[in-house]
């Protein structure tokens, strides 16, 4: 039997008021302490290069310190726990159809927090609570419709947290991040970089969508923590360019990407590009048997007719069905739960 008390950890860490109305209707600029203008990736292509250079100059303030990756390599931080948390964030992002930026911001908040503050445990309930709080904050920054704190806890969570516990964790995250939530991300660069390769804009949609997929598919891998958002965006665009026969012959990642904007590092872009290519090969190797198995299941399923009146089948797959609570462990400020 393991006893969890959040009050000792959170009360010592948070010195804010208990007035939780702060999280109900504030403007997103309040969280960042900066301008409330929303710099979406779709607008980046129309900005001059010096504006993008300003993002490159500022991105260092929105990433963990340079030794963060080494903490996973030395196992002072649990890489598998981080990977599980990121995987859960991506599942919830897909479940609620959140923007890719929301998921990326949630992971960014989590990494910056873990760099600056040590959790009472490197895995288990502390990491899950942190992931829920970071995703909630990211959704409040970017989404129009935000689920309740209870409804965030879907997609295979092991513990259920009370709303007041999550809110206090949100305050702790805000405090540790100095309320700087308007982070610089790869999505601030990909449209601009795509135009550098394809000035006509013919393949712009293809570039943005596929680069976004590459970025999110690699976000679980701790090795990418070595690279800043601009390098990740440039490397992703180069990977996409090599998928297009009309562009792959003229795109050389070893020659041109650092000329797209002042402040880019050729060495980091090339290294990140190589890592993405290696990860793509590895993922294809691991996923091929699963894809074949799924295709076989689909073929078998398609040969079986399902009666329209089969209400039990419908109700079991309905996303609106009531969630069962018996498989979860409740965790609150003054309660204990066994692990």
Swiss-Prot record:
One example of a Gene Ontology biological process annotation: cell division
Keywords carried by this UniProt record: Cell cycle, Cell division, Cyclin
Tissue and organ distribution: Expressed in roots, leaves and flowers.
InterPro entries tied to this protein: Cyclin, Cyclin-like_dom, Cyclin-like_sf, Cyclin_C-dom, Cyclin_N, Cyclins_cyclin-box, Multihaem_cyt_sf
Record-stated family: Belongs to the cyclin family. Cyclin D subfamily.
Oligomeric form and interacting partners: Interacts with CDKA-1 and KRP6/ICK4.
Primary role: May activate cell cycle in the root apical meristem (RAM) and promote embryonic root (radicle) protrusion.
Name listed for the protein in its UniProt record: Cyclin-D1-1
Provenance organism: Arabidopsis thaliana (Mouse-ear cress)
Gene: CYCD1-1
